[in-house]
């Protein structure tokens, strides 16, 4: 995966510089849409077909996007460049890199919250608020339920993990007893 990230980074950075001149959120939406469309097996099949010109592939991709930016010259140039350089399959990684740049600019971060039980609105808001104080930045939560945690939560922000689950505590106790 590191290779894909390395190849995708310059594309994401270049697109981010373009997006800084306009609406970064709108560009983020466009990149996310492109990533979803580019993952479709049918699209990858058409993109790799020698019977379809690169211009036709770019037009197909742009037609599949709902974002109003898709009709702009900059978006067309970006998609055409990806098609010409056979980098359509990198679109999901480009989207990840673009989102990371956007978060860095906003002083925010994505947070993965795995809970043993579903979190309700007030609980989630309180948890996110306390995590924002701890990590000292704005957090964008993605919540997942995993009953194997038994209780508590496991929080991942970037490469930092905060595991307060019962399962983690039991594993720690087991390690201490067997050492």
Swiss-Prot record:
Keywords from the UniProt entry: ATP synthesis, Cell inner membrane, Cell membrane, CF(1), Hydrogen ion transport, Ion transport, Membrane, Transport
Subcellular localization, as worded in the UniProt entry: Cell inner membrane
Signal sequence bounds: none
Membrane topology, record value: Peripheral membrane protein
One example GO MF annotation: proton-transporting ATP synthase activity, rotational mechanism
Any single GO CC term annotated in Swiss-Prot or TrEMBL for this entry: plasma membrane
Main location: membrane
Keyword Ribonucleoprotein: no
InterPro entries: ATP_synth_OSCP/delta_N_sf (IPR026015), ATPase_OSCP/dsu (IPR000711)
Claim: Iron is one of the keywords in the record: no
Family: Belongs to the ATPase delta chain family.
Subunit-level organization: F-type ATPases have 2 components, F(1) - the catalytic core - and F(0) - the membrane proton channel. F(1) has five subunits: alpha(3), beta(3), gamma(1), delta(1), epsilon(1). F(0) has three main subunits: a(1), b(2) and c(10-14). The alpha and beta chains form an alternating ring which encloses part of the gamma chain. F(1) is attached to F(0) by a central stalk formed by the gamma and epsilon chains, while a peripheral stalk is formed by the delta and b chains.
Family annotation (HAMAP family): ATP_synth_delta_bact (MF_01416)
Function: F(1)F(0) ATP synthase produces ATP from ADP in the presence of a proton or sodium gradient. F-type ATPases consist of two structural domains, F(1) containing the extramembraneous catalytic core and F(0) containing the membrane proton channel, linked together by a central stalk and a peripheral stalk. During catalysis, ATP synthesis in the catalytic domain of F(1) is coupled via a rotary mechanism of the central stalk subunits to proton translocation. This protein is part of the stalk that links CF(0) to CF(1). It either transmits conformational changes from CF(0) to CF(1) or is implicated in proton conduction.
Protein's UniProt name: ATP synthase subunit delta
Higher taxonomy: Bacteria, Pseudomonadati, Pseudomonadota, Betaproteobacteria, Burkholderiales
């Amino acid at each position: 995966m590191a290779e894909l990230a390395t190849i995708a980074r310059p594309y994401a950075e270049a697109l981010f510089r373009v997006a800084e001149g306009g609406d970064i959120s709108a560009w983020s939406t466009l990149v996310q849409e492109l990533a979803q469309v580019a993952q479709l097996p049918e699209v990858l099949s058409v993109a790799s077909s020698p019977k379809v010109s690169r211009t036709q592939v770019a037009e197909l991709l742009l037609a599949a996007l709902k974002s109003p930016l898709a009709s702009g010259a900059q978006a067309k140039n970006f998609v055409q460049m990806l098609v010409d350089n056979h980098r359509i399959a990198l679109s999901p990684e480009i989207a990840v890199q673009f989102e990371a740049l956007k978060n860095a600019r906003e002083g925010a971060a994505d947070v993965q919250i795995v809970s043993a039980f579903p979190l309700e609105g007030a609980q989630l808001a309180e948890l996110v608020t306390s995590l924002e104080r701890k990590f000292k930045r704005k957090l964008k939560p993605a919540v997942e339920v995993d009953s194997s945690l038994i209780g508590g939560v496991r929080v991942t922000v970037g490469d930092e993990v905060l595991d307060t689950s019962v399962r983690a505590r039991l594993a720690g106790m087991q390690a201490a007893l067997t050492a």
